[in-house]
Structure formats: structure tokens, C-alpha cells
Amino acid sequence: MLRYTCHALFLGSLVLLSGCDNSSSSSTSGSPGSPGNPGNPGTPGTPDPQDVVVRLPDVAVPGEAVQASARQAVIHLVDIAGITSSTPADYATKNLYLWNNETCDALSAPVADWNDVSTTPTGSDKYGPYWVIPLTKESGSINVIVRDGTNKLIDSGRVSFSDFTDRTVSVIAGNSAVYDSRADAFRAAFGVALADAHWVDKTTLLWPGGENKPIVRLYYSHSSKVAADSNGEFSDKYVKLTPTTVNQQVSMRFPHLASYPAFKLPDDVNVDELLQGDDGGIAESDGILSLSHPGADRRRAGRYLCRRAEALSYGAQLTDSGVTFRVWAPTAQQVELVIYSADKKVIASHPMTRDSASGAWSWQGGSDLKGAFYRYAMTVYHPQSRKVEQYEVTDPYAHSLSTNSEYSQVVDLNDSALKPEGWDGLTMPHAQKTKADLAKMTIHESHIRDLSAWDQTVPAELRGKYLALTAQESNMVQHLKQLSASGVTHIELLPVFDLATVNEFSDKVADIQQPFSRLCEVNSAVKSSEFAGYCDSGSTVEEVLTQLKQNDSKDNPQVQALNTLVAQTDSYNWGYDPFHYTVPEGSYATDPEGTARIKEFRTMIQAIKQDLGMNVIMDVVYNHTNAAGPTDRTSVLDKIVPWYYQRLNETTGSVESATCCSDSAPEHRMFAKLIADSLAVWTTDYKIDGFRFDLMGYHPKAQILSAWERIKALNPDIYFFGEGWDSNQSDRFEIASQINLKGTGIGTFSDRLRDAVRGGGPFDSGDALRQNQGVGSGAGVLPNELTTLSDDQARHLADLTRLGMAGNLADFVLIDKDGAVKRGSEIDYNGAPGGYAADPTEVVNYVSKHDNQTLWDMISYKAAQEADLDTRVRMQAVSLATVMLGQGIAFDQQGSELLRSKSFTRDSYDSGDWFNRVDYSLQDNNYNVGMPRSSDDGSNYDIIARVKDAVATPGETELKQMTAFYQELTALRKSSPLFTLGDGATVMKRVDFRNTGADQQTGLLVMTIDDGMQAGRQSGQPCRRHRGGDQRRAGKPDAAGLRRHIAPAERYSAGGGRPVAGERVQVAADGSVTLPAWSVAVLELPQASRRALACR
């Protein structure tokens, strides 16, 4: 595949073929030419009769390696490159991802987890590997993705047994087609198997296949794929390529390709012509052919195009003179603007004009088009199908949509009719200008449906909607007001842009609050399931689930079985499946058609800021698209500029899927522009105050920093943070990871404190979920029957907790578990530096968020059997205290203050309202409501069964107590600036820890914060945190006179509950302190008119 455009255009597929006519692949040579212009090497033309004629080799066509037997299916992967390789091919990493759904359910052993790569080949021969797949029946179909590791070689495919009656099929890497036989696939595979040629600038091609070959050409076809004709000859137009060197600029932009051999295209090559069809690189030497079809990836449309394209505005833009429609589609052969009426009838179709300098297409219309619906009719070569496709597609720059995102709509976001009263004057309640401002952030992560779907005090028509946040007297809004008053400053909304996986047509949806009969109507699979008898029961889905949970067990997990059917047609999804990046999601509006969602979204933002007193953060997902390819309804960008917006495998050309879905390519300039343009709309037109980037490590650091600078020009106080996990993309660019972002001011989530407090890691399963206790669940002080944690390991977890509470600073100095003086970066975290930040505002500390099990469920997994319900509630409070009283930005999941449970669900993204319930009436924490989804948690059923009934299910008393604890902690954080110092140098001067080293009292964390009033003398005593089953006496401090620091929240503790410290902390005259078990105390030492704090 060749690459070249704003970073390179990834072109075609490469195959190594051996032999031509049993001897040579070429004949006499001459100069390439074209009609009327013979011999011009820069213009693709018909080959001169005297030039080399390239032919296919004489390779035997294969038969089937194996045929499917009864209740089996067979999939062959035809590997042309392997056939001609001089060494045997290794297929050990090739595997299948297999899954059932309501319409495709013949598999007897579907793969439960995307990271499960165990379905390796059954066998292989010289033509490639094959798999024998067991079936439950010989009718229907199966879903399959062929992968190398977790990267797709072929996008999602369905094998229908009505189409392939012998259930034996073949596929080719990089090609979505399914073939009836290996012979058919083999014949189609020439030129398709690999894609390792990369067009990196206007005249440079990097291609291993051309190395040391005397004849290297780039073939081209505008109407069909480059392929041999019936005589086995390649007769399409071509240009010659000559060897060159890789310049430093290319090496810096594409470090993972820097070692590839380079070839030069003619200076006068017509790039536009090459971009709009299929291209094929062919090299020949001594009878060995290398073929690459550069058209297989239009990934980069020319740096020279991007510079001009970046300066333009896209979408439907309203001006004084009318509406300008513009779309960037440099590889398209034709684009038409299709205008639709409100009832979606075609009104007009207008050919758009291509700007050759930018690759953008545009059309100018009148102002009467405001409110009109439209789509783009594309004529474009798509490398996945290897043909010129014709289809309509919505506008990736759309600002409004029809129901279910089927049409884009022309809209003026400045229209006063789309703004609630007072919108233009709305400001953020909490300043974000300085590090000290940012350090005060306490973020409450929330999901629109989770906020109100179950709240009976919210009007029925608003439940699960944006406008639920305007229901001032509802339990949910009143609860959020209490959190805000106690110190929660920000609400973060899980994805609220346009989602791909929730149907916005209400007649196609059945939620659990609705009659079971409706579920049967919209999901026909229910009628043939074990639950069919409920279709005429008159019950709601919720009532049936409530009935089923009474007898739910690991051996008969009926709740999850029914909920899996519900999930196929309900309104629930977390939303990490972007469809249109810059339009509010329609299912959260009372009317998904057109502009209602815009005004309702703004009304919600206004209510959060004015009534709740919180700033608003938005969760954004630019690291992947929901789909790619020419056929999927939710593929948008990839239909417009095929394979430009997606990150491709540099060898096969297939779309990478390391994120979860179709990886995007923010390293490409025009996608980076789309991201920045999208963020600008959310910032200016929707008044979002911060952005949380999903899987930010898949973005280049430079792109994130560039976007931040762009958005800070619009709002200087904007805050960026995200998931800075290592994405293994560092060979391509410097990734936006935890360590790389040190000193930038951009925040990243810290897994260091998370894992130390919770115990284990996010991928634990089975007994490991119980064995791996953490600081917050008994490590070293209250071991369970399975734990193997040593005292040394428990002390190391305490070190990571201390470091996290100091803001995870790379240069913070502390005494470690062995008594050694170390910097934060020298504290080990699974082989990585424990401390990585320059300032605590670059660290987002948490012990619970939407990913993985809730904090309560993890405590339930890990707590010792003798830990009673009250102790477990206090474990939750003590765990949260590490976040709330630490120096990093505090982050927490909605419902942690209510002991929120998801009934042990590891990944509740599509587990619906049943498992994601939050009860703002404080009656039920949703614990033990059925076994979680078997596809994710089936391997955990045994351990769940052993621990789930260890203590009583929390009720109103425990939820009120935990709410009081939570508000006490947030009020403590708010009560003094010493908890939120913000600056790394200041933290290192003022924060220290006691009770450290090899002789420490296990289970006692003591942190001191000096207010700086007396240089050279300790002016504060630790916030003290004690875990364990008995009272603990902390050693004598440096100064007497300590007293308890009282948080205002204690005056309104819900239900008159005790503070987190339980019985009053005992402070002796000499300054020694005695703490109850599982408690937190903040002490202060009065000093003149100022106070210094001692925490934990």
C-alpha cells in the first residue's frame, strides 16, 4: 500500500510472486507513454509496445485444505505472500474473533473478550492457515473477524450458510470479500495480500518490495482495480519509479518507516489523477515480481493539498450571502449535494465543484436552505472493495441531524431560537485560570441515563434526557446540589455527542421500564427465547428481571441472559461509539429530529452551571470511529476519504483496531483539524469547560498540544485531561501518554493510586480478584483467605498511595518501604516510574470510574469474611479519602457516595439501566441483582458466588452514612487551600509523610502539610488514615497542641451519621493521636492567626 497525503498516502496491497511463464516476468522494454504523449514518464499512459510486459507467474491454484464436516464451518486465509516466501510462514499470532448475536447465532464457542487471541489456526499449508469452527447448527450464519493478535486483518464479516452451503469459505487479508473456495480467493488475491508501500510526500514512495529491483513502476486505473488481464498481463497505465533516499523530514514524520527503501515519482506526475483510482506498484527482477496496489489506501491526500485544505471551513456554513457547503474529498471522482425536505424527499441535487489546490468540493446556495436536510452523493474509489463506489453520506462537519443521524441539517448555532434565555451571559461557576484553581477541581463523572432513568421524582418524559437536570425538585438534582455545596466542583458527562449504537426511532426501542410485550415486538429473538412466555404476561421488563433475580445463580444466570436481549434494542450505551463528533446525541433529547437537541443540551448546561454551581466537562472520543468501510451505515469519514482518517497496518493495509473499533488517525493533519474544529464548537457554542480524552495515548502528543493551544485561544481557562495509557504507537509518533505529558499542564488519569488502593489491576479475573487486596480493602491488615500479599508488598502499596496523595510527582522525595530515600520516579509501578508528573494538576486521581467494577464491588470481592457491613462502608470512605485529601485533581464516579454497585459487572457499557442503576432515593445500591454479563464476567462467576452473600445488602442506613462520609471528605478538601496546592515545587516543600520505612506501622498513613508560616519548622501534622481492626496510636509528633479540623459538612451529615473518624479522635497533651479502625482524621495546629493541616 502506498502512503501519501497530509502525512502520506497509504496506497495499495503488496504481493510477492515467483516466476512468469515458468521463467521470466518481463519481455523487452521501452519508454512508457500515453496516447498523444508517448514517452512522458510523468503522465500515466498506455505502455509502449517496446516496454516491459509484466505477467503473472505460473503458480498452481490451490484446492481446499479441509472441508467442513457435520456441525462445522471452515475458514481458510489465503496468504499469497507466504506462498512465495523463501521461508515457511508463521501463523502463530493469527486468530479469529467470533461472536453470536440475535440474527447470527450458530457458533458453539464464541470468543468472550476482544483480548482473547486463543482461536489460533487448526492447521496450515503453503497457501495459508485455516480454522475448523464448531457449530450448534448448520443453518443461519456466523460473525467472524480475522486478526493478527488483536489487530484486524479483515473487518467484520458474516458467513451465511445459505450462501455457502458447504460451510467452507476463504478470505484474503485486507479484503472484506468472502469466497466460496480457496481457488476463487487465490485468483482474486494477486496484488491484494499486503499493503506495505507508502506515499509519504508528493514524489516519494517508500516500498520494501521495490528494493534492488531494476524495474519499478506505479500502475493506475481510474475505473477498476489494477489487475492482470485474461492473458495474465498488466496493461494499465503507469509511471516509472526511480530509487532515491529518505530525507530527514520524512524520517522524522514516519519513524516507523524510516528504514524502508525510497523511490521517486516523476516531478510532473499528475497526483490528482493517481488519487482518484486504483494504483499498483510493480517491481521485477530475475523473474520475481513484487506488486503493490497503492489505491488500496487513499490515506493521505497530499501535503500540498492539506496546507490549503486546513485553511478552509467545512460543513454547511451560513453567511450573509446564503449557505456554503464544503466537504474535503480529494480522492473523490465526483460529489453532489443532495437536498431533502422535512419528510426526506429529494428536493434537488447539485454537482459540487472541486478545488484542485485543496481537494475540497463546494457549492453555494441561498439562505432559504437554512433548516434543510442534506447529504453528499459520493463517487469514489474505495480500497476495501477495490472498486469505484457510489453512495450518499452525511456531513462529518454536521451541527444538526435528523432522527437516527440519517441526514445532516443546515443550522445556525447562533440562532436565538436555539438558546435558552440568558445563554449568552452564562459563565463557569469555578475559575480554571491558575494551577491553584485547577487543583480545587473535584470531578463527578456521570452518565445522562444513569442520572435520571430511575428517578421517579423526575417527570416521566424527561427521564434519561438532558432536561432531567432542570427538574429542580427531583431527588437527583437535590442530591447533586448537596454535593456541590460540600465541594464537588465539576460534572463530567460521559459521551453526549452523536452515538452510533442507540436507535433514536422510539418505535424501535424497548427499555426495561416498558411492557415486556414491547420488547417482544422490537426484538423478534425474544419470541424464540426461553423468555417468550412473558410476551403476553402484562409485566414490564423490569418486573420480569426482578422476578428472575430471586433465583439467579452462577449455574442459571437468567438475569444476564434476558438483559443481553434487552441490550440489543434499549436506549442504553455509554457512548464510546462516535457517529458524528459535533452534534449532541439525539436519544437524550425529547425530540431527536433536528434542532431540539441543540437547545435542550444548552438548557442542561445552563442548569448545571446556574442551579447546581458546577463546571461541565465533556468526554470526547476521537481515537476511533464506530465503523469504517464502504457499506456500514455508521461509517462516515471513511466513505468520504477512504482510509485517510483511519490508522492502517503498515504491511497489510487493514484498518487497525487496537482501541476497540476502527482506529482513527489523529496524526493526519486533516483529522487533527477536524478534532480541533469540533472542540472549538463544543467550547464556544456549548460552553464546555474541559475535555476528557478517551484513550488519549492513541493521539500524538503534538496533536493534543496543538488542539489545546487552539482551544485556549477561545477560552484561556479550558482544561484538557485524558487516559494517557501507553498505546504501543510510539514507533509512529510521540504519544500523548502520562510520562510524555509531564510539564505540559495536560492531565492524565493515574493508575498508580488506583491500583494501590483498590488492589490488583483492571484486568484481574477469577481468584485474582480476591487475592489482590489493596490499601482500601485490607492489604496487610485484614487479609482474606486467598491473599498471598506479603508485608513487603503491602508496604509498597502504601508507598504508591503516599506518592499518589502527593500528586504523583516525579521529583517528590519520600522514604520508601525499605527506608531508602527515593524520588517519585524511582518508586516502581509494574516496571514503570511510579511518579511521572511535574505538577499535581497533571494527575487525575481516582479509585472508581465508569470502567471496570465499582469501588463497592471491588471491596466486596476483596474484603475478608470477618469484615462486617459497617467496616466495608468505612473501607469505601477510607479509599475515597486517598483521592479527596490528596494533592492531585480529585475524580470519582457517579454513585460512589451511594455505595454504587453494578452487581460485579466489569464493563457495563451495554448492560443497560438494570445493572447501571443509581437510586437517588437512597434505598438500594443495586448490589446482587443478578450475575453480570457472561461474555465479560463468566470466568468470575465462581468467585462472585462465594463472596456476594458475605454481608447484608446495603440499605438506606448505609447509603445515608456513606453520603455523609462523602460530603465530609469533599468539605474537608474545600475547607483549606493546603489540600489543593496545585504547584509541584510547593507540594515538595510543604508535603511530607510520617510512619514510613521498614519499621512503619502497617495500615497507618500519616501525611503532613506545612502552611509555610514558619520556615524550617514543622507547622502541620499529618492527615491520618488508619486501616485495620483495632485502634491505632500514631507516634508523638513534633509539636503538641493539635486539634481536630472540623469540616462544615459534619453539621449536616445525612441521618445524623458519625464522621469518618467514628468516635472522636483522641489527641493527647503530648500530641500523640489515637484513631479508630478504618477512619480518617484531619488535625490542625493553630499558629498565630493561621492553621496548618495534618491529614490522614
UniProtKB/Swiss-Prot annotation:
<dbReference type="InterPro" id="IPR004193">
    <property type="entry name" value="Glyco_hydro_13_N"/>
</dbReference>
<feature type="signal peptide">
    <location>
        <begin position="1"/>
        <end position="19"/>
    </location>
</feature>
<dbReference type="InterPro" id="IPR014756">
    <property type="entry name" value="Ig_E-set"/>
</dbReference>
<dbReference type="Pfam" id="PF02922">
    <property type="entry name" value="CBM_48"/>
</dbReference>
<dbReference type="Pfam" id="PF18494">
    <property type="entry name" value="Pullulanase_Ins"/>
</dbReference>
<feature type="active site" description="Proton donor">
    <location>
        <position position="723"/>
    </location>
</feature>
<feature type="region of interest" description="Disordered">
    <location>
        <begin position="24"/>
        <end position="50"/>
    </location>
</feature>
<dbReference type="Pfam" id="PF17967">
    <property type="entry name" value="Pullulanase_N2"/>
</dbReference>
<dbReference type="GO" id="GO:0051060">
    <property type="term" value="F:pullulanase activity"/>
</dbReference>
<feature type="region of interest" description="Disordered">
    <location>
        <begin position="1014"/>
        <end position="1044"/>
    </location>
</feature>
<comment type="similarity">
    <text>Belongs to the glycosyl hydrolase 13 family.</text>
</comment>
<dbReference type="GO" id="GO:0005975">
    <property type="term" value="P:carbohydrate metabolic process"/>
</dbReference>
<feature type="lipid moiety-binding region" description="S-diacylglycerol cysteine">
    <location>
        <position position="20"/>
    </location>
</feature>
<dbReference type="Pfam" id="PF11852">
    <property type="entry name" value="Pullul_strch_C"/>
</dbReference>
<dbReference type="GO" id="GO:0005886">
    <property type="term" value="C:plasma membrane"/>
</dbReference>
<dbReference type="InterPro" id="IPR013780">
    <property type="entry name" value="Glyco_hydro_b"/>
</dbReference>
<dbReference type="Pfam" id="PF03714">
    <property type="entry name" value="PUD"/>
</dbReference>
<dbReference type="InterPro" id="IPR006047">
    <property type="entry name" value="Glyco_hydro_13_cat_dom"/>
</dbReference>
<dbReference type="InterPro" id="IPR040671">
    <property type="entry name" value="Pullulanase_N2"/>
</dbReference>
<dbReference type="GO" id="GO:0030246">
    <property type="term" value="F:carbohydrate binding"/>
</dbReference>
<feature type="site" description="Transition state stabilizer">
    <location>
        <position position="851"/>
    </location>
</feature>
<comment type="subunit">
    <text>Homotrimer.</text>
</comment>
<keyword id="KW-0378">Hydrolase</keyword>
<dbReference type="InterPro" id="IPR024561">
    <property type="entry name" value="Pullul_strch_C"/>
</dbReference>
<keyword id="KW-0326">Glycosidase</keyword>
<keyword id="KW-0732">Signal</keyword>
<keyword id="KW-1003">Cell membrane</keyword>
<keyword id="KW-0472">Membrane</keyword>
<dbReference type="InterPro" id="IPR041111">
    <property type="entry name" value="Pullulanase_Ins"/>
</dbReference>
<keyword id="KW-0449">Lipoprotein</keyword>
<dbReference type="InterPro" id="IPR013783">
    <property type="entry name" value="Ig-like_fold"/>
</dbReference>
<dbReference type="InterPro" id="IPR013784">
    <property type="entry name" value="Carb-bd-like_fold"/>
</dbReference>
<keyword id="KW-0564">Palmitate</keyword>
<dbReference type="InterPro" id="IPR005323">
    <property type="entry name" value="CBM41_pullulanase"/>
</dbReference>
<dbReference type="InterPro" id="IPR011839">
    <property type="entry name" value="Pullul_strch"/>
</dbReference>
<feature type="lipid moiety-binding region" description="N-palmitoyl cysteine">
    <location>
        <position position="20"/>
    </location>
</feature>
<protein>
    <recommendedName>
        <fullName>Pullulanase</fullName>
        <ecNumber>3.2.1.41</ecNumber>
    </recommendedName>
</protein>
<feature type="active site" description="Nucleophile">
    <location>
        <position position="694"/>
    </location>
</feature>
<feature type="compositionally biased region" description="Low complexity">
    <location>
        <begin position="24"/>
        <end position="34"/>
    </location>
</feature>
<dbReference type="InterPro" id="IPR017853">
    <property type="entry name" value="Glycoside_hydrolase_SF"/>
</dbReference>
